[in-house]
Amino acid sequence: MESPVALLLLLLLCLGALAPTPGSASSEAPPLVNEDVKRTVDLSSHLAKVTAEVVLVHPGGGSTSRASSFVLALEPELESRLAHLGVQIKGEDEEDNNLEVRETKIKGKSGRFFTVKLPVALDPGSKISVVVETVYTHVLHPYPTQITQSEKQFVVFEGNHYFYSPYPTKTQTMRVKLASRNVESYTKLGNPSRSEDVLDYGPFKDIPAYSQDTFKVHYENNSPFLTITSMTRVIEVSHWGNIAVEENVDLKHTGAVLKGPFSRYDYQRQPDSGISSIRSFKTILPAAAQDVYYRDEIGNVSTSHLLILDDSVEMEIRPRFPLFGGWKTHYIVGYNLPSYEYLYNLGDQYALKMRFVDHVFDEQVIDSLTVKIILPEGAKNIQVDSPYDISRAPDELHYTYLDTFGRPVIVAYKKNLVEQHIQDIVVHYTFNKVLMLQEPLLVVAAFYILFFTVIIYVRLDFSITKDPAAEARMKVACITEQVLTLVNKRLGLYRHFDETVNRYKQSRDISTLNSGKKSLETEHKAVTSEIAVLQSRLKTEGSDLCDRVSEMQKLDAQVKELVLKSAVEAERLVAGKLKKDTYLENEKLSSGKRQELVTKIDHILDAL
């Protein structure tokens, strides 16, 4: 008798054999029918946007099984250029009503196939309406491939008249929206009608599964064929309140290549000259963006304009030259964001919610995108949640100021992106808040070591032998510097007393004059005493400068005598004991003698 464990293993193996293989369409899935399909092909820009409103019916046909999913197919000619595929239930207005889509395979059939999971299984005889949105890049080909500056741009698009599907279609219509009314040619299947820039095909009846019939249109399209060939988006997160974003962008005009020379004169004079070229475009930045900069290889580009709106910041980017077909340019845009709008935490758990790619220009196409998210030093247990598939490279380390073991860098790649990819990714990580003190402590430690080193250095004697003469010269120089300072201070006392005398002559207030005299005597005595002390120190050091200081002291005594004499003369003038003419003559003589003495003192100071 077999053990219960063996029986359980056998049962699990049987169930695994009966289950459908992941990534392949189940052969047991009930057949469905496209009861009605309304296709809209928007070719008004450089993208091909195809929207199909499909009414799916579960015909039953003796089958009682319910359909929990259905299969979408893409033509082999367009599958490699698919940028976005989205499926929604028609009529539902919820923001997140996209159905789950997974790529699958069907044996014996070319093209790409996707399994779409229905929110509610479809019973036999019931129906459901879905909206399928697809966006294709680089499927509008310029024809001719080269044009002159004055010519208009024409493009060719090739697709399928029919809704390519693994299910039969009962009725189908197709509406094609073009960029202009100027149409060179288009296929005439089913006698389509044309109105201005719109072509209407159908209705087509009873279309078998996997039906293909080439649809081709050749028309004028002067919309900007602007492509981001390569873009690197760097997001640097700081727990000190800031998130820095920088985008390195390589742009190329992928329309018809310019043939012949470029005339800026004609370009400025004629409005329709270079009609398919690109003068400028607008980039929408987050509303909280600040410290915005825009530069290229040369430097800052001053032709850009910034407009702050309620819900965004609009930046007009104008390259240094207009972009014609085949022309390229490179630029860098950067800005700062407050972290409280994008960074959330609960204890040591952090979550960064930011856009994987942001708006660069309307109808944008990005061939290759690299996103680098620089987290704070010490971030661990990093997990990334993305709304769509992205490729991850091994994490890197980034070193900047005060880093010790490096900041972790998440590196992610994706190709062929459009506006529908402007969605948020969430980065989860853990971070010990104690590490926020690391950088301030490093700064404190660095200054402490610097000051301690300087203190030790100035106290060390690195000379091999001592030089008494050099030390004596240094002492004399130090004393001389102090003497110069004191002499200048003493001369300043005289100037201040002169101002006091002038005020006395105007106000006739004798108390002002007496107070000035007393202040002069007190401060002059103190300064002169200090100079005498320094003079004795010079004599002790054996310097001949001692005699010059002594001579300067004698000259200063004469200057002081003249200053006090001038005050006495002013006193007599105010008292009416001296005529004004006599006073002015005496004052002139006194000033001349005083100036001569001060000049001699200055010469001695220069000699010191």
From Swiss-Prot:
Keywords, in A-Z order: Acetylation, Endoplasmic reticulum, Glycoprotein, Isopeptide bond, Membrane, Signal, Transmembrane, Transmembrane helix, Ubl conjugation
Cytoplasmic topological intervals: 459-608
Function of the protein: Subunit of the oligosaccharyl transferase (OST) complex that catalyzes the initial transfer of a defined glycan (Glc(3)Man(9)GlcNAc(2) in eukaryotes) from the lipid carrier dolichol-pyrophosphate to an asparagine residue within an Asn-X-Ser/Thr consensus motif in nascent polypeptide chains, the first step in protein N-glycosylation. N-glycosylation occurs cotranslationally and the complex associates with the Sec61 complex at the channel-forming translocon complex that mediates protein translocation across the endoplasmic reticulum (ER). All subunits are required for a maximal enzyme activity.
Glycosylation sites (chain numbering): N300
Name listed for the protein in its UniProt record: Dolichyl-diphosphooligosaccharide--protein glycosyltransferase subunit 1
Subunit and partners: Component of the oligosaccharyltransferase (OST) complex. OST exists in two different complex forms which contain common core subunits RPN1, RPN2, OST48, OST4, DAD1 and TMEM258, either STT3A or STT3B as catalytic subunits, and form-specific accessory subunits. STT3A complex assembly occurs through the formation of 3 subcomplexes. Subcomplex 1 contains RPN1 and TMEM258, subcomplex 2 contains the STT3A-specific subunits STT3A, DC2/OSTC, and KCP2 as well as the core subunit OST4, and subcomplex 3 contains RPN2, DAD1, and OST48.
A GO CC term attached to the entry: cytosol
Source species of the chain: Mus musculus (Mouse)
Positions bearing N6-acetyllysine: K188, K539
Stretches of the chain found on the membrane's Lumenal side: 26-440
Record location of the Glycyl lysine isopeptide (Lys-Gly) (interchain with G-Cter in SUMO2) cross-link: K539
Localization terms from the record: Endoplasmic reticulum membrane
Family: Belongs to the OST1 family.
